[in-house]
Amino acid sequence: MFGFLIGVFFDRREESKCEPLVKHAPAIEPEASEAENYPLSSSADDKILAEALDAVETTILGSGSCLHVTDTAAMPPAGDSAAAAVMMGSHSPGDRLMIEALESVEASRGLTHSADTCSQRCSIALSAPQSPQSRVPEGPIMDSGQIFAVSGAGEEENWIDDEDMALCAADLQIDPIGDAQSVGGSTAACLPPSQKEEIRILYATDGYPVVCSLHLLLGQALLQELYVIAYSHVTEPSAHGGGLLRATFYLLAATGCERQRQRVRPVFVCSFTGEAADKTREALREGKPLMVQDVIASLDEAQSLALHEDLIIALGTICSAGKTAAAPGGDERNLSYNYVASTLPGLRRTLASLMLQYETRVVAAFRRKYNASFSCPFWFVSKFGPSETSLVAVLRYYLLGATQDDGIAGSFDLQGVKDLAVTFPKPGANASGLTAARLNTFAEFSRFWCCSELAGPKAEKLFREYLKTRVSSDTLYVQSLDSLIEKYRHALRLPAKDFVRFVYLAYHEGYNRAAVEAHMEEALRNGGRAETAATRAQSEFFKGLREMCSMPEYFARNVDVAVKRLPVRVAEEHARLRSYGEIPRSGFWGFCWPSYDVSLRINKICAGPLCCLGTQLADAMVRAPPDDGDKGTCAETAATIIHHDSDASGEEEATVKVCGAHMPRANKRAGDGTRISPACNEADTRAPLARLTALAYSDQRPRGIMPVTLLLYSLDDTSSGADTAVKSEAKAQDRPVPVYRVAMPGGGQAFAVVARDQWDKTVTVDVFSGFMAPKSPPESNGPLGSDKDAAAVDDAWTRALLARAWGTSYARRCAANVGASQLYLNRNEVLSDSLAVCNLPLDLDITLKPSSVGRPSMLTLHMAMRSVREAIVLLWSLLFADAEIDPDTYPVYFYKTQCDAAAGDEEASPQRRGVGGGDDDVAWGEEDVEIEEMWGGYYSQTAMNDDMIWDDAPDPQMDIDSDHPAHEPMDDGAGAAIEEMKTAAAARFCRCERKIGFRICVPIPKPYALAGLSVAKATSALVQQAIVLQEKFVEALDQFIADYEFVDSGVYSAGRSLRLPFFAKVNARGVMVGRLLPFLVFPPKCRDRSEFVAQHADPNNFHVGAARRDNPAPTLIITSVTVRRDVLAQDNRAHGKPRAGTARLADALAAVGIVPGNQQGTPGDACAVDASWLLDSVAMPALREYIDEHFPRHAAEYRDARTDCIRVYEGRICAALRRGGAGYMSGRRSNFTCLKYQHRGASMQTVIASVVVAVNSQGLPYAALQTRCFATKCGSNELQTQFTVTLSATKDV
């Protein structure tokens, strides 16, 4: 209990040092009542605690100031010796002497008494400056005549409660020089400036150092020697011998507050002179022990005892107070701390008395102050070692030299300082001949430490300079990397997943093992100074980041483009077979049906006309790719019942290749009149959309007829002129035809094949009919002054164009239940790898931050899209190097998804209705045929022809609002008009809540085309990179963008569909929302704005496979766009060396001189090796030799083992092992015993062994012994490899 409370005492002491009290105790008038002076006081202990706290505040705040503390303890008036004697607990005739001694002590301390004759209380007004005892005194502390009153031999010891003692001591515990003496602080500040040389010494003893040190303070030598653990020079060493040497001896500290954790505490101070100084210097140089008698002779008693004054007074006061209160006639309520403390004798006598009566408890108190738990040098070696640098230089700096504010490494922990010392030059051989591993006694440790080259004052100074330089270098390194990473963090504008990857890779680049080792090696060469921090930007990683910040440089270094040049005639044929050509914009030829009707049509065509034309396309249209694992014949499962109205091909025989075999076409009919088709069964039939695209995009021409022609027209025998019509149209339609997916209400979908359509009369009529171009300023057809002016003109034209779009009217936004009508509300082009990419539609979705940040204005959006256009045109000029691209005139067509709450229609917003409208811009092809067949809204071909006219088309003669700001006359000049446009654009805000969707259609310039969707995907990824590098785009939308990954590259996959401009998507309530409408972004030098606006309605500008008029037959086909692995790309390559498992086993055996037993099989294959010969002649002898050497106890089991159940795989041979011999044949168990453990009982002999011969990662053949043990500790029959041996023709390793 006592020890715990003393610990509390030290903790509170440290807190008081870190946070000094600032309040002053007010003076209490003499008339104050007892209740006021001692509120809620019930015992003398409480009163002592209260007074002790006042005294602590006095000691803390009394330095250099006048402080008044009122003591409310009852004291006798001056001169009342009897009362004083009673209070002192002394009944001897010498009371008068003690009273006089008290008065002299009070006078020496500056105490003045003021007695109150009307009361038994008296007030002591302390108005003295700092007492000499509160700091390091130069003279005697107290009169030597003062005697500590102790009990006689027969008296009973009287102690107050341990808790009260500890709390009182905690209040009194103030280290007057704690700041100067703690943590290797500046002791020189507390010493006279006249000293020539001063050092700090950390010491140890063979016995318990705390007890030895207390006796040493009292002039007693329990042990003969002290050992130097470390020493540090405070001042420069003396140039001549015999000079004054002042040494402060330290022990490890045990306590300290969080702000200033003390590592060592001073114990005593010595002033060595003459021969004693020379002996001490010699002992420090050679590591000899210090003689305790010499230390006692040179002990500075006043200085040393002052280091412990607070603790000695606290212990003495409490003990004395307890004795006085217990004395006969003593009143425990009339005790005063100041009075009791003033009765104490000198510090040495007080300490001697305490040690005489209460040695155990005094030692316990000092144990809380000093950590002397180490009993051997191994403690220091384990903490600071094992290298000599850390054991000498680090130990001295960390314990004796470091302070929190030294500007070097004072705030570092021990491991941090040791890490810094790694690059410090290693010292030479220790003069003592000892090593850290041989330090068994403190004498050896002292000799090792002092004889080190790092122990001298020059080495100490050099190490401190090194630490300072190294910390500065490391700090520069870290700060440079952090600033560099922070710079790119804001410059790259990466998507979320790439941003996380960038942060990890950037810090890994700066702090990986190789980088840190390079930095440390340079610091080692340059004495702690490393200049690589400023040049880290030259590494490959940061070079790659800089390249990513410049699109031309990034493209030149990281993008490879493969181009195929076609002759003109081949290019024309390629364009005919791989593109739609120019899509007609008048008339109608096509259909829009649900998947069930589409399947019927395809089945009908495949069973009839295609087979009659003698083509193998029919089976490819209906069969899914065969499963490689299916070993059955297709003839047994190929029959599918197909309802057919008539047999257009007659009963003639034909052959169709099914699964690689030619089969005679079935000419029999089932009992219900249906015909058995050679096609596959329904389980193997491809999905309707895949079959539809295969027909629509097919480049085969059986008998000169495209399969899409057969798809568009029914080959019904009842039509007498069907064949003629087919041939006539086939000659006209000799190109692929667009295939569309149409989203229906309720989650259904239909499919459409439309060769020509009335785009101007049905699709875009509501947007462009009656469009009146704004009356722009005279220079509006030329370049404008700024991007903001151009964006304002773009917005004015966009508002004028979309004034009458049906998307702004709720009455015209209801989805149709009939496919042909819904075809004009929602249409998604199905993508295919069979088509060349002539226009690249980009799906741009900008995810927005929460609505609290606001929404961008239309002026901001137009400015952002203009920067997007600049990025795309720049990329196009790099990607299509041979094309003539004018950045000021090249067309890029923008379409924006209508806002969620368009035209103020609250019900149009899915978020406001509580309905989650899905994103139907991009969708997969149908994957569940049953869902489509459940939709009952399909209709016949006749019904389709009746619904082709859209009844909701607006009247072309409808007038446009003449009050539109864009149509106002420009009489006031162009500047005023543009300012009005900017004001109007800035006042209109986008009302999209989650994201802003754009469709950007970019024509491929003449004479280029992209070969397939993989090239389109790579190109779109480059567009993403180009956009984020546009500073204007980032500046405009950075505060709104939640994720910088907005270009969807995953849409370019076969079977996926992309919504076309001018079409909307259907939400869960059957309402059409989010229609893609033109968002005009004029080129800087647009020659004709009206013509440019009209081009947005041309389907040849936004269909992927539509050939434009200016590029009908591309001659340069980009076959691949490869982006080299940039610095942020994930490394998908296998780590380490490529495994040689793919290497041929026979080749590996031949390489080491093992000749196969036969030459059968394919050369280089495992089959070319005689497995039995290899196992019995090569593998088993090698395994037996290894077992004999390492498992001799099991050698007998494997000596007669034989191989069984040999299995030959590609690259390896496996075989089971059986125990041979007569025992095996007689029925004895053939299993083996465990090689790892000695099992008992049923698990004793349950191991199944096998051998494997394969090729390792170095390409060498090896044999491995694998076992399965049924014991639980062996994994319960888990396959384990026990060992491997490398096979060789000469010997087995």
From Swiss-Prot:
Q: In the UniProt record, does the keyword Zinc-finger occur? A: yes
Which chain segments does UniProt annotate as zinc-finger regions (CHC2-type)? 1234-1274
Q: Which UniProt keywords apply?
A: DNA replication, Host nucleus, Metal-binding, Transferase, Zinc, Zinc-finger
Does the record bear Metal-binding in its keywords?
yes
Query: Which EC number(s) are documented for this chain?
Result: 2.7.7.-
The record's annotation in InterPro entries points to:
HSV_PRIM (IPR033685)
* Site feature (Essential for primase activity) residues: 843, 845
Q: Could you give a GO molecular-function term held by this entry? A: DNA-directed RNA polymerase activity
Gene Ontology cellular component list: host cell nucleus
What the record says about family reads: Belongs to the herpesviridae DNA primase family.
HAMAP family tied to this protein: HSV_PRIM
Question: What functional role does this protein have?
Answer: Essential component of the helicase/primase complex. Unwinds the DNA at the replication forks and generates single-stranded DNA for both leading and lagging strand synthesis. The primase initiates primer synthesis and thereby produces large amount of short RNA primers on the lagging strand that the polymerase elongates using dNTPs.
Protein name, per record = DNA primase
What organism is this sequence from? Psittacid herpesvirus 1 (isolate Amazon parrot/-/97-0001/1997)
